[in-house]
């Protein structure tokens, strides 16, 4: 009987930790990183530029408001686990631009110029 109570208590504690451990919104996700801030965009991407030129390999997006953001194209400065995520973000932005999907919010690192995208939230 005591074993069952301990198991139930442990399961309840573990479940509550797991439920609160993963961020549920872009705001919660962004708060986990230093040098980040949330930009509320609520607009379509006005321009999409992809550069493969040497040290400036990146995707740059701009909005009507004039806000400009970047995603670096994976290079030698990135570890393998980062490269796939960066490629996915680049692909997501390209598709978002081509389908004219609205970007709701961006979480960006504000210690780079232009600000570098860490996370994206979209809506139709």
UniProtKB/Swiss-Prot annotation:
GO CC annotations, alphabetized: extracellular region
SUPFAM superfamilies noted in UniProt: Bacterial enterotoxins
Signal peptide: 1-21
Domain of life: Bacteria
Pfam families found in the cross-reference section: Enterotoxin_b (PF01376)
MF (Gene Ontology): toxin activity
Bilayer-crossing regions: none
Record GO biological process: killing of cells of another organism
UniProt keyword list: Disulfide bond, Enterotoxin, Signal, Toxin, Virulence
Name of this chain's protein: Heat-labile enterotoxin B chain
Organism: Escherichia coli
Disulfide linkage: 30-107
Subunit and partners: Heterohexamer of one A chain and of five B chains.
């Amino acid at each position: 009987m005591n074993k069952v109570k301990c198991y139930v208590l442990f399961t309840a504690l573990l479940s509550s930790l797991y439920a609160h451990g993963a961020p549920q919104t872009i705001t919660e996700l962004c708060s986990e990183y230093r040098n980040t801030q949330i930009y509320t965009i609520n607009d379509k991407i006005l321009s999409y530029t992809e550069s493969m030129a040497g040290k400036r390999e990146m995707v740059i997006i701009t909005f009507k408001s004039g806000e400009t953001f970047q995603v670096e194209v994976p290079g030698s400065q990135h570890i393998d686990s980062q490269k796939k995520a960066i490629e996915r973000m680049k692909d997501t932005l390209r598709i978002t631009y081509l389908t004219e999907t609205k970007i709701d919010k961006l979480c960006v690192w504000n210690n780079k110029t232009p600000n570098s995208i860490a996370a994206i939230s979209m809506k139709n």
